[in-house]
Amino acid sequence: KAASPSTRIWYGIFERAATYAGLDTLDAPAGWTKPSQEYLDNFTNEGADVTVALSDAALDAKRCAMRAHASQIWVADGTTTRTNPEAAVAALHEPEHVPGAYGLSNLLVMPLLRAEYFQLGQGEPADDLLGGL
């Protein structure tokens, strides 16, 4: 069933400026690299319609969710799993802004940011995810 025109659809995005800024505050773990601009520009978006700051509890929940998918995501915080038996640690130079890092199987480091970014895909604009509902 197709969504009605009034249905608001939000896409979770990687906001380009935030991603670049986050990468500037960390060093990749040994054996990992930072992604190239060309790579990042293929999937990041310029600007977000809504930014949601993550509380410490939400950030911890996000880390736990990432760790639960160890065959897909490797959190670079020194933890090990059967899938990723070698510890990977990213150097975090501004942990108050970028409290962690992770990578996929390509071992390209990505910043764990203190916000989630969304772009409106359909529906009336709003200044928050649930605005007007």
Pin down the residues of each PLM region.
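Metal-dependent de-N-acetylase/amidase catalytic core
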Residues: 1-133
